[in-house]
């Protein structure tokens, strides 16, 4: 089951889906399969700029060993890749995400990013800002209403920098 994050950030990443609907679908799946079928399921997510600050919460919500964090789906040059994440957010995520089979590759990637940290260039920030502005305009929403505080502040500061 693909899920990237909990709460309002889920609603931003998975627009137009609602977090409450996700919970309802999981409850339905559990009620249908409980004791009747031998069906097991796990969760997968794609770590990215928008959700890295929230992954520890997601992991605790779903169970660390039921969540596989696939960090290879966003190319490094993508505006939403982990290479765009500020150092302090990476450090916090590293402390917050539990080390287990489903997160070991991500944790090693974060450690590598921190060891070789280079802040995003102005050109990268411009691409990120433009992409977020296009998303928000198209969806008639605003990132400030959905994303976690440090990520939201980083985007706001980036908008100021490139304007």
What are the language-model segments listed below?
Residues 101-163:
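Radical SAM enzyme core and accessory elements
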Residues 12, 24, 45, 70, ...:
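Intrinsically disordered, low-complexity regions enriched in small/polar residues
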Residues 98:
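Acidic metal-coordinating catalytic centers involved in nucleic-acid phosphodiester chemistry
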Residues 3-6, 32, 39, 46, ...:
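Extended aliphatic helical segments
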Residues 47-53, 66-95, 106-110, 115, ...:
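Flexible glycine/acidic-rich beta-alpha junction loops that bind and position SAM and/or redox cofactors
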